[in-house]
Amino acid sequence: MRRGLVALTFTLLLWLPLLVRGGQKNETQPAFQTSDRCVACHNGLITPSGKDVSIGIDWRSTIMGNSSRDPYWQASSRREAIDHPESKDEVEDDCSICHMPITRYEAKLKGKKGEIFSFFPMNTNGTKQAQDGVSCSVCHQVSNEKLGTKESFSGNFVVDAPKTKGEHPEYGPFQVDEGHQHIMQTSTGGFKPEAASHIRSSELCATCHTLYTTARGAGGKELGVLPEQMPFLEWKHSDYPAKNQTCQSCHMPEVAGDAPITAILPVLRQGMHQHVFVGGNFFMQRVLNQYRGDLGTEALPQEMATAAEGTVNFLQSQAARVTIQNLDVSGSTLRLDVKVENLTGHKLPTAFPSRRAWLYVTVRDRDGREVFQSGALNPDGSIQGNDNDADPTKFEPYYREITSGDQVRSLRTFWVTRTIT
């Protein structure tokens, strides 16, 4: 008798969304839903081995889930608008495409430009649509139209219109039966899951991770476009495509063994990828955690700390391999070669130009006393001996051989501009 009561109660709860929302089927639905409508079913995901692969918990501690809260992006956008006040509207529209995509896309549908500054500070003025950053229903609604072409870059992804009212397609990698389709469609207000292979393609990521920005001069004059962030094109010209290693292969690691993708009537699937979107920005994850009140961070402190630790581990194990070769001591002179192998499918570092990588080398004598160092980091984040850190108008030379502690072997992107009259 008790088993029958439990089954009856579960059935009533399961179909409650249908009873509540059934009359809305033919009404016009919003273009997007925020993540809170998704995580109700896509959290609480435990593999048979006991690993928690909850999609919502993983996502909300990522840079993707906090793209609109990112203080570096906020400051960069503000700086650009201050430098070019006459182009403020264009700056906000461009900078919101991939960092605040829901509000920007909805503005676009109304024939307006995207806004940024009206939502700052995010902890008080940010709407849920603005706070959600790169949300679930953004990526999972991008169609395969023009993917991989230049027309799709710089945030020019296409979101499919519903085939009928109340049937916005939400693309995923797995076939979904009619029962699960109905549950999702009724509980989200008209979003219907569909299997589509392009959701696992690098070309999907390329829509925002291939960025051409507008270079502006005096008075906001457009001088041309700048290939600012090119990780997808770098990947495309690497050996990774031939090895069938996509962006998702590294940045969304596959779960070992079977895993459920929903907590409601769960079905174990082979080949689920975790939504950790691990990259290189552990520093920003720590900032988001430390200043969570100011930035409106929703992920729990331990979740952010775990995500930052995962990023560090990812960098240390999968970004590069450093080995010492040809070690030679002659008299009081020590010579050695340092080999750095790029293990990524793109440049190292890549994407936004503020990133850099450098060699930190120390030599100690038999008593453990330091006798040489190059590339030491100062408390303020500057590198000892780096000419560019000491004077922004200078550049640290490219050294094939380091012979002094004030010489640094570093890698970063520099943009050199000149005025043509």
Regions of interest found by a model, annotated:
Residues 1-4:
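Positively charged n-region of N-terminal signal peptides that target proteins for export
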Residues 7-17:
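Bacterial N-terminal signal peptides
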Residues 15-25:
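Bacterial Sec-dependent signal peptides at the C-terminal "C-region" and cleavage site
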Residues 23-49:
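N-terminal module-boundary/linker segments of secreted carbohydrate-active enzymes
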Residues 31, 35-36, 88, 92, ...:
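Residues immediately within or flanking Cys/His clusters that coordinate Zn2+
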Residues 38, 73-94, 104:
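N-terminal catalytic scaffold of extracellular/periplasmic and nuclease hydrolases
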Residues 45-82, 112-421:
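Primarily the internal scaffold of c-type cytochrome electron-transfer domains
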Residues 92, 97, 101-109, 118:
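Conserved, well-structured interaction surfaces
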